[in-house]
Amino acid sequence: MLLLGSLRRTLSKIESLARGISWADAVRITAAKPNGCAETNLSVRMLNRQVTIRPGTSDLRCIDKVFVEQEYWVPFETTPRLIVDAGANIGLATLYFASKFPGAEIIAIEPEPSNYDLLVRNCSGLTNVTPWRAAVWNTNIPLKIANPDAEKFAFSVTPEPNATSAIEALTIPQILDKSGYSTIDILKLDIEGAERELFSNGCEEWLPRVRMIIMELHDRYTTACSRTVYSKLCQFPFRQEVRGENVFILFDSEQ
């Protein structure tokens, strides 16, 4: 009975993964012994291209989140010109947005070196995607990875004035200035608790220049994260939808 139960769970996992990647890859990646180091390529159905992930890491969970559960499916009608993917990880959400909104320019921002390397490779050949190695913050201050031993999708940053190899901090106004756009149509935030810092100071300056926010809130990592964010959001009229771990905020066009 134990063997039968294990087989059923394995088949269920394969069937679920095959909604987002090829059947062959779903079988192979489920049967593989994870080592956390080697890379493998998966054929993603909706992209008609392969992506590189690291078996044994959180990358496969991200494949499930983005391409199986489609947690970044946008519930509001929009034709974005500029999408900013802050906390882009290895580029899976970036690729999802590029597929759904081929006319949009996408800036993908990721601070952690190994994730950034895969982000660049996974998005290679896409002329509308520009990767930046940086972190989003509320001011210009040197940053470092606060938890280098964390899972690949859970790296967070913290100020470190004396860091020898600091990560560049970018504010939202700086991103807009560098992009050449006056507004961000979709701002995706998956920044592992840094959303509290981002909204705690100066966000009143840039929130009127953002049309939609897609974010994952991280109260499990950062105290009063949601309270800080919503205390600022509530100064502006908006509609909200929730899909999986993501909150979708659509601002009133007249704000």
Predicted regions and their residues:
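Phosphate/nucleotide-binding beta-alpha loop and adjacent structural elements of enzyme active sites
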Residues: 1-255
